[in-house]
């Protein structure tokens, strides 16, 4: 049966655990299992786009199963060759296809055929048209076969990509700024007045700071276009703060507690946990260190790499909210001192700013009105 499934703005942790065991026990009723499928993705993927076929736990599920965890802490020039973004996309498309089929038919199919139009972005420092074409071709060149497991039941999803567009990081964020509306600029306008509106960012010189879990991208944009040679990526982010915090916590409690980084973060969020105060204190200390490193990188790029030729420093990304209390005042003081401005994207929009921009590009540029999947 053909299902023309074109998912939109699906979000999931960029984490994969390879060589996991296929589920053998049915834990939940069917409707609950389908509803939670994107958070419980285990899939066998057979695709020439991957170095080898395999069974993977994907996204949130990879935090709880499998001995090996692979995430998107990607080195320079690596994302277009890495298997993780391909595994993530195929798993998400397959799970969404099963959810959509079940929504309309109230039963699991044995197999589904899916057609997809997909957009994504490569790091600006990695991007050039030939590299983008190679990455696009990994999706376009064949049918990808995914057996996605709903509890212990496999559903075969055959995925064909009709169109794929790879742009460079920075471009989607600028489109999101231009189309973002007053809510995005409320704090900015409170600090600097109403003189600069959303549309004006198309012609301004921007230092975009995209703070993630394992990496922070520093993207220099002039009149809407990233200047690739002046963009950098550093291994700063929330994940690194958590790693440092876990070490500080271990030193503080002085007992041998076996705990992964993910389990440590659960203690941080659980206010009733016996060790919550110590874990939270360790994380706050570690965040200060990471904040200082990010701020130092911003000032160094601004003053040296970019020779001060910046109108606005724009901070966003999934990790930006965690660092705002430690960074915002110091960053604003710095930008004020060099006749520039700070735009810290609100936490409601910051994690999805790239996805918002890709949706705009899908409608206005890439696919012109077609609802398409996108990924970061």
Which residues does each PLM region occupy?
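Nucleotide/phosphate-binding catalytic cleft detector across ATP-hydrolyzing
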Residues: 2-206, 292-315, 320-376
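A short acidic Gly-Thr/Ser loop motif
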Residues: 1, 199-216, 221-224, 235-238, ...
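A mobile "lid/hinge" subdomain adjacent to the ATP/sugar-phosphate binding pocket shared
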Residues: 249-285
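Contiguous effector/interaction surfaces
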Residues: 286-290
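Detector for glycine-centered tight turns/loop "hinges" at secondary-structure junctions
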Residues: 5, 224-225, 272-273
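Glycine-rich phosphate-binding loop plus the immediately following alpha-helix
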Residues: 19-30, 170-185, 213, 219-259, ...
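Conserved short-loop catalytic and cofactor-binding motifs
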Residues: 233, 282, 346
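Short coil/turn segments at secondary-structure junctions
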Residues: 73-80, 229, 278-282
